[in-house]
Design a protein with these regions (language model features):
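P-loop NTPase motor module signature
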Residues: 1-162
Length: 162
């Protein structure tokens, strides 16, 4: 990006945003000022939903979502490990919740248009259940979400030199 900016588009500005990078080192490397923005905190209530070892992820997630919808207002965000699980849970939830609740997937393989739909309230005013990978944990704020269900599962890339 620095090469393009310096050689092709001097008018181009680079903005690097991260909650985890060392801001001072990055600002020094880019020879740029460091800007800071304070986040906001909200009260959080943590509850554990009992898992059933003999039950697959899809029915467990369905039970947790149905419980959340019946006991809490607002939309529900569910973190799942990957595209395959999102597709399976989406199908299971569509069968029991549609058309009263909008069930939306959110992962990197979706079109930009489909991803943007998640950022908008449902045009029919329905509650929403958003099924996302853990990438959404730190990259996007979804309006209307009042309950987050975390499966506790995530895919983490590993490098194997062999």
């Amino acid at each position: 990006a620095l090469d393009v900016q310096s050689q092709v588009r001097e008018d181009l500005r680079i903005v690097a945003m991260s909650a985890t990078l060392d801001g001072e080192r990055l600002a020094g490397f880019l020879e740029a000022p460091r800007l800071s923005s304070a986040g906001r905190s909200f009260p959080v209530e943590i509850a554990h939903f009992p898992a059933r070892r003999d039950e697959a992820l899809e029915p467990q997630t369905r039970r947790a979502v149905e419980h959340a919808l019946s006991t809490h207002p607002g939309d529900v965000l569910v973190f799942l490990p990957g595209h395959r699980e999102i597709t399976r849970v989406h199908s299971a939830l569509q069968d029991v919740l549609a058309p009263a609740v909008q069930v939306l997937p959110l992962h990197g393989e979706l079109s930009v248009e489909a991803q943007s739909q998640v950022l908008q309230p449902d045009p029919q005013g329905r509650r929403r259940v958003v099924l996302a990978t853990n990438v959404a944990e730190s990259s996007v704020t979804l309006p209307g979400v009042r309950v987050v269900i975390d499966s506790g599962l995530a895919r983490e890339p590993h490098y194997d030199p062999n």
